[in-house]
Structure formats: structure tokens, C-alpha cells
């Protein structure tokens, strides 16, 4: 929940009439506030430490991003469309914003345009910091603290420290710059980036000093701000910094802060909507049903949140590219709507909001004033924070696309500190076959993060590409010590061991790879190829059959299985798989040639001639097919000498 967004002014309207400060410092009570709002990070860190012992960072991130990040959009949506008075007040926003954002997000993901990702990121950071600022305003309202300087310094603290944590995070900054350059954005010189980082850090220190001086001054003169608010600021900002800069895996960091944000949001929205339902008889239907005072309905509330978030979870696991793009557009539109709606439906400065939170005072409405109507100002804000930047990013990407290697080189120049930029640059170089440079970048990445198992594996692959097998082995051993249950790493190491002739060890790692990745067609296919080299034909055939169960449209698996069955003497079985391979890939010349040999073995010479001829039509330089065609034609001439004259 936030008081402000890109669509509202960073100020709070003074309450009126003035009331005596309330002595209650808490929104609920001391222990519940500490658990749900202030001390939540202290509980989340050990919980996530235990979770990482069971699940990978990627699994934790996907689960939280789905059921938490998207799921917590639902309560705001229920209020937007279930509160009749609110809907009437902002009807056109609630009608047109979803249609507009869904169309834009779907279009951007359909055509793989990255600009929308930057918009979501910046809106998301703003949304997170404004939720913290919103809680500051609520806690100060509890003690009757409404002076302008206090709220402005609170706002400045939230903005500057959230921005500083991102600017000084090598992962966050490099990822943001990478997306920006992926959109074709102009190069930002390293001096600009580095001076900007120094400036924002100095600004954060200066604002903190001003905040502390003001707090002490107010305390001395007897106008004491709520100390719980100060504790909230400290824990929120410190936790945001920890999640962006100090966690071992950034995915875990993102998930950690998301859960903190969601717990705060969901609990406060439950309290607000429940009070709203009790005090406003005009609210009916689904919103009244869900937010009645009933312990069992809390379970329903959580269940609805998880059900809404399941859309994002399904999207993360769906395999169909078209459906994935559509669902990603839907999830992104929901995210932006959540950020947008929270900018105006939860303004604590308005009397109705305060009453539902147990606060006094406030204003009936907010008149922005000015020379232009409110809807014009609102449209200008949309243009400033969405339409114009997104339009520029779209234009750059469609007209000024930058090659990946160049992009990553720019990112490394801007952010030379940190493992991620060097790793991404190395990956881009490796794709281009520039292995010497890739190896150097991987080594730099490992200097910053020696425990990056993926970097060790990628370096081993690059060294293998240089035929430096002995140098690659220690990196694979390190990667597997760090992540012993990573099936992909076992597969890479098995392939490496196979190449240096350590077949007994390779067999163990191939078996581990297929055990840890039982649904990976590639793992089973690689293991099958290994078994073929050992002459274990029955096991080889069984693995290929498993591959085709997992991926029926795998022409090379069909081809190899057909060859194995052919060698075993199962001609009819081989024929079926040759034909299946050709249905999947009609240009697979080897399949035509081998099917021709099968027909030749069966004495179906005319059919063999057809297959060899087709192989030569597709590849006129296919010598084996040419020789086989001559053999078939000679056999045909012996059978039908008159026809050959």
C-alpha cells in the first residue's frame, strides 16, 4: 500500500480539525506490529535460510514472484471494483487503464520489446518505497505528528535510500543497464555512472544527517515523532539494502523483500477493507462477503491471493511460446495496474481512508488545483512516466538495435565491479566463439564471486572448447561441490570426462544427470550417445525410447533409434522411426540415405532408389548416398536387365 505514486503529489494534506495526539504508537498492537510491519525482516531471514536448504534460489524466487508478487495484487483489485463509491469516483480510470495496459503489455511481449521491463522495474521501486513512506505517515498520524518538514524528510529518506541501494548494487545496476542497452539506448559513459553513484551516496548521507538533526530537535522541543516509525524506516531501508547488495544470490534477495512487502500490504489491506465494510453499508456483494469479521475468511482471503498468483506460476512453467507471451503480457499488465491503482485508492490524507485505519482528521477530497483540469494533469503524468519513455525505448530498439557483445562490453565498462556484468559479457563472447576473451571474463567474474557454480561451469565449457580439458576439470569439481544436486552440471561434467576417456566416472555423472533431471530429453539423449560408444545397445535403445517419450518431435533421436534397431535386425521398427524422423524433419538427408539402405536390405530396390535420389537432391555432394544409389541401380539392372537397356 502506498500514499503516493507517479500519479499523486509527494505531500500530505494537513488534518483538520486539529486533535490531541494519541498516545497509542501502534497500528494494531506492539507484538502484531513488530511481526507484520516493523520486525518482519528479522523473521524472514532465518525462514529463507531454511528454505534454501530445501529449494534452489530459482525455485524460491519463482514461487514468491507468482503467489506473492502477483497474488497480492488481488485485494486492491477487489477494492477498486467492489467499493461502489470508489468505483464511481474513478470509473474511467478503472475502465480504460486495464484495457490500455493489457494491449500495450501484450504487444511488447508479443514482439519481444524490452522497454516495458524497465518501466515495470522503475515503477516497482517507486511502489516499494512509497509503501514504506505510507507506513511512516500512518505511524506519525498515530501520535499527531503532521508537520510538513517531518513528512518531507521521511519522503526524502525513502526515495534517496531506495535509489542508492539500487545504484550501488552491481547486480541491479548492471541488469538495468543491460535492459536499457537492449532497448537500443545511447551509451552512458562510465564517468557519468561513477560520478552519479558518488553523488547519490553523498545525497543519501546528507538527507540522513538532516533527518537525524530534525528528529532530535523535535524530540527536544517535545513534538516527538513516533519512534516506531523510525524503527520501521531503519528496518525497511536496511532490509532493502541487504536484499540488493548483501545476499549471496540476488534472486533470494528479491524474494525476501517481496515477502516483506506482501506481508505488510496484505495485512493492512485486510484491516482497512474489513473496517470499510463494517462502517459503509453501501459496500455489498463479494467485497462484503470476503472482508467480514470472521477468522475463517482470513483463510479464504489468503486462498484467493494464492489462486490469483497461480496465473504467474503457471506462466513460469508453460512450454508453449505463444501462450507464454500472452500470459506474460497479462501478468505484467496486472503488475502495472497494481502500481497505478495504489497511487490513488489508498491516500491516507483523505478522511475516509483515515477512518478505516482508525485515524482522525483528514480531508474529504484533494483538489490539485492549477490552471488545467485534473484529468489533464493526470494525462500529463501518464505521458511523463509511461508513454514518452516507453515510446523512446520502443523507437530505439526497433531502429537502433545493438549487438549483444557490444551491449555487454558497455555494461562492463559502466559497472566493472561485480560478478554479473563480467559473467554476462563472457557468455556473449562465448556465443561469438571468442573463447580466449570469454575465459578471461569468466575468471574476472569468479574473482568477485568464487562461489558462483554457474560461472565455474561456463568457464569449464569454454576451456573445453579450447581443448584445455585438464584446466576444465577442477572448475567442474568446484561447481558440483557448490551445487551437488544440479543435474545440468553433472551432464556437463560427464561429457567432459567422456572426452578425456574417464568413462567409469562419466557413467556415474550421466546417471546422476538423468536421475536429477528425469524429464530432460537432452540429458537422456546425451546418456544414450555415451552408451552407444560403450556398445551397450539395449540400454542405448531404452534411453532413446525415453527421449522420444519426453520429446516426440526429436528427429535426431528418431534417427539414432532407427539406426540402432536396424543394426539389431528389427527392420520394421527401424522403418517406422526413419519415417517418423522424416515427418519431423523432411530435409534430414541422413534419414533418406539410411532408409534407402534398409529398403535395399529388404530387397525393395525401387524404394531404395527413391530414397537415395531424394538424399542427393537435398545434398548433391553426399558421397555415401551417391554410392548407395549406384549400388541400388546396379542391383535393379541385374533384376530387370531388359528395363535397364
Segments (PLM) and residue ranges:
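Internal/C-terminal transmembrane anchor helices
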Residues: 231-234, 370-399
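Hydrophobic alpha-helical transmembrane segments in integral membrane proteins
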Residues: 388-413, 420
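Membrane-interface helix-loop-helix junctions at boundaries between adjacent transmembrane segments
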Residues: 107-197
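Short coil loop/turn residues that delineate tetratricopeptide repeat
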Residues: 417-418, 451, 485, 519, ...
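Conserved alpha-helical positions within TPR/SEL1-like repeat arrays
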Residues: 420-430, 454-464, 488-498, 522-529, ...
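Central hydrophobic cores of alpha-helical transmembrane segments in multi-pass inner-membrane proteins
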Residues: 61-80, 128-134
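Structural signature of tandem alpha-helical TPR/SEL1-like repeats
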Residues: 400-412, 431-444, 454, 465-478, ...
Amino acid at each position: 500500500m502506498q500514499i503516493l505514486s507517479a500519479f499523486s503529489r509527494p505531500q500530505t494534506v494537513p488534518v483538520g480539525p486539529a486533535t490531541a495526539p494519541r498516545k497509542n504508537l501502534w497500528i494494531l498492537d506492539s507484538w502484531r506490529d513488530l511481526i507484520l510491519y516493523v520486525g518482519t525482516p528479522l523473521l524472514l531471514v532465518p525462514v529463507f535460510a531454511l528454505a534454501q536448504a530445501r529449494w534452489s534460489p530459482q525455485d524460491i524466487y519463482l514461487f514468491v514472484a507468482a503467489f506473492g508478487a502477483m497474488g497480492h495484487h488481488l485485494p486492491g483489485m477487489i477494492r477498486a471494483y467492489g467499493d461502489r463509491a470508489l468505483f464511481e469516483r474513478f470509473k474511467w480510470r478503472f475502465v480504460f487503464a486495464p484495457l490500455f495496459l493489457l494491449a500495450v503489455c501484450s504487444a511488447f511481449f508479443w514482439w519481444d520489446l524490452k522497454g516495458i521491463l524497465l518501466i515495470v522495474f522503475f515503477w516497482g521501486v517507486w511502489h516499494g518505497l512509497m509503501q514504506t513512506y505510507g507506513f511512516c505517515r500512518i505511524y506519525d498520524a498515530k501520535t499527531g505528528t503532521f508537520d510538513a518538514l517531518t513528512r518531507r524528510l521521511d519522503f526524502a529518506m525513502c526515495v534517496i535510500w531506495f535509489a542508492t541501494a539500487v545504484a550501488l548494487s552491481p547486480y541491479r545496476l548492471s541488469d538495468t543497464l543491460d535492459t536499457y542497452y537492449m532497448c537500443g539506448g545511447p551509451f552512458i559513459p562510465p564517468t557519468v555512472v561513477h560520478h552519479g553513484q558518488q553523488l547519490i551516496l553523498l545525497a543519501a548521507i546528507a538527507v540522513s544527517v538532516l533527518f537525524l538533526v530534525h528528529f532530535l530537535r523535535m524530540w527536544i522541543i517535545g513534538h516527538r515523532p513516533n519512534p516506531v516509525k523510525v524503527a520501521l524506516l531503519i528496518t525497511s531501508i536496511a532490509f532493502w539494502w541487504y536484499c540488493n547488495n548483501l545476499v549471496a544470490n540476488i534472486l533470494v534477495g528479491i524474494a525476501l523483500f517481496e515477502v516483506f512487502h506482501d506481508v505488510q500490504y496484505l495485512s493492512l489491506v485486510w484491516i482497512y477493507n474489513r473496517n470499510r465494510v463494517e462502517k459503509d453499508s453501501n459496500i455489498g456483494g463479494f467485497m462484503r462477503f470476503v472482508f467480514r469479521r470472521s477468522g475463517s475468511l482470513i483463510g479464504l482471503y489468503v486462498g484467493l491471493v494464492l489462486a490469483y498468483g497461480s496465473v504467474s506460476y503457471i506462466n513460469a512453467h508453460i512450454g508453449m511460446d505463444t501462450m507464454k507471451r500472452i500470459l506474460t503480457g497479462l501478468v505484467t499488465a496486472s503488475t502495472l495496474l497494481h502500481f497505478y491503482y495504489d497511487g490513488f485508492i489508498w491516500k491516507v490524507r483523505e478522511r475516509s481512508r483515515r477512518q478505516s485505519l482508525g485515524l482522525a482528521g483528514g480531508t474529504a477530497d484533494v483538489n490539485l488545483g492549477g490552471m488545467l483540469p485534473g484529468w489533464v494533469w493526470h494525462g500529463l503524468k501518464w505521458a511523463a512516466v509511461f508513454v514518452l519513455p516507453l515510446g523512446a525505448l520502443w523507437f530505439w530498439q526497433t531502429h537502433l538495435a545493438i549487438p549483444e557483445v557490444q551491449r555487454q562490453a558497455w555494461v562492463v565498462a559502466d559497472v566493472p565491479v561485480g560478478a554479473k556484468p563480467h559473467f554476462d559479457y563472457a557468455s556473449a563472447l562465448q556465443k561469438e566463439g571468442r573463447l580466449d576473451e570469454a575465459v578471461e571474463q569468466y575468471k574476472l567474474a569468479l574473482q568477485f564471486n568464487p562461489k558462483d557454480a554457474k560461472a565455474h561451469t561456463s568457464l569449464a565449457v569454454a576451456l573445453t572448447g579450447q581443448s584445455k580439458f585438464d584446466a576444465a576439470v577442477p572448475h567442474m569439481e568446484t561447481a558440483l561441490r557448490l551445487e551437488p544436486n544440479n543435474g545440468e552440471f553433472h551432464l556437463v561434467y560427464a561429457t567432459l570426462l567422456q572426452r578425456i576417456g574417464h568413462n567409469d566416472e562419466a557413467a556415474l555423472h550421466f546417471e546422476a544427470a538423468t536421475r536429477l533431471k528425469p524429464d530432460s530429453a537432452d540429458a537422456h539423449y546425451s546418456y544414450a550417445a555415451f552408451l552407444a560408444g560403450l556398445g551397450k545397445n539395449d540400454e542405448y535403445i531404452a534411453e532413446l525410447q525415453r527421449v522420444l517419450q519426453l520429446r516426440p518431435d526429436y528427429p535426431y533421436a528418431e534417427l539414432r533409434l532407427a539406426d540402432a534397431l536396424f543394426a539389431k535386425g528389427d527392420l520394421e521398427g527401424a522403418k517406422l522411426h526413419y519415417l517418423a524422423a522424416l515427418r519431423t524433419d523432411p530435409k534430414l538427408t541422413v534419414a533418406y540415405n539410411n532408409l534407402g539402405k534398409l529398403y535395399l536390405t529388404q530387397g525393395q530396390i525401387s524404394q531404395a532408389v527413391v530414397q537415395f535420389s531424394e538424399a542427393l537432391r537435398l545434398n548433391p555432394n553426399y558421397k555415401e548416398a551417391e554410392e548407395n544409389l549406384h549400388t541400388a541401380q546396379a542391383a535393379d539392372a541385374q533384376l530387370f536387365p531388359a528395363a535397364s537397356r
